[in-house]
């Protein structure tokens, strides 16, 4: 690799390939979920040279689950988990906090034709939610984790037609749901904006930054977590792999990549991932008078009927706020700062369309969060090269699918077997992206916004 470090930079092990990592997450400090929590203690930063049994790169849902499961299955093993930021400020702590059992976009007519495939995907996601539910309960993690389900809501005729397709899809796979008319929507949401909704009961809502912070602090004792430790170089070997950070290194015979859209920077999956940033804004805490004027339920999550519409959370953990999330942008390098104000202007319009009586309530935080898609919707799971394993690209179902894929990857590494593992291994691989991918994403995003209309 051009410009790569030499063997002498990595110590005494023999390596087949050295690589300078050339793609990094760059996050600002305006993640509302993180900022409304108590300040973190100073992190443990990787310093010096560490040798262990496993190195896991990436402290999101997949990395946390993989590290935990490796530690559970091999209590005598030493596991190093490395993240380039603080847990909670990374991508895992920047989502809307929908821990879903089936994808939001089951609206397609063709979905009902793939009954067995859809039911298998839902079972896989629910296994991830069950593992999280068990872990959160066992360690008493305070993160607002509650099985409230999710609402899919429409505000236009087009949106109502999409809800009809969604209901047909749910009927075809024997999934239960409840339909709300306009009056019921107003009663639940505190606004007359929505004309119809479907409530799917099996998803969870969560404060994502609080959850991943709790998952990190409750890791087994044989997991060493290092934060603010960006991996800058990697050496792949026949016997050992070594990763370097600014102040240290970690070497292990087995390397686990839980790096999602940044995996390209480590030399894998070139031109196969679509890196996006989705944007959200959160109000300041509502006053008692504002809450009374708003009415509605104190906590809920809304997914727009149209895929390009606005997601909404009314949040009570740790306090009373409203979050709106819409629009996405293409970015390999997590350029959050320059586009944050652009996103906030769009969110302000969406917020005031829904709650004009709260027009004076300002946003306190606006931020972006990275996610990764593949063009054909397939994930990456398994061995990327000898003794380098990866679970990457969860296509918008990161909390559930990222968790179960990290758990299953750990089980695969140590030789555990299960039907779920076979299902994961049987999945396809991402196909190659089309030329001018970034331009295509931008055109697609603009077209979707225009079609979404009032539902944005």
Predicted feature descriptions by range:
Residues 1-54, 72-73, 77-78:
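Extreme N-terminal leader/targeting segments of oxidoreductases
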Residues 3, 330-449:
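C-terminal catalytic lobe of FAD-dependent flavoproteins
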Residues 3-29, 105-110, 134-214:
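Flavin (FAD/FMN) cofactor-binding and adjacent substrate-gating region
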Residues 58-62, 84:
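Glycine-rich Rossmann-fold phosphate-binding loop(s) that bind the pyrophosphate
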Residues 71-94:
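Glycine-rich FAD pyrophosphate-binding loop
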Residues 90, 94-124:
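Glycine-rich active-site loop/strand segments that organize a redox cofactor
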Residues 138-146, 231-233, 238-241, 249-289, ...:
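Active-site substrate-recognition segment that forms the wall
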Residues 161, 168, 193-253:
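Helical element adjacent to the flavin cofactor pocket in flavoenzyme catalytic cores
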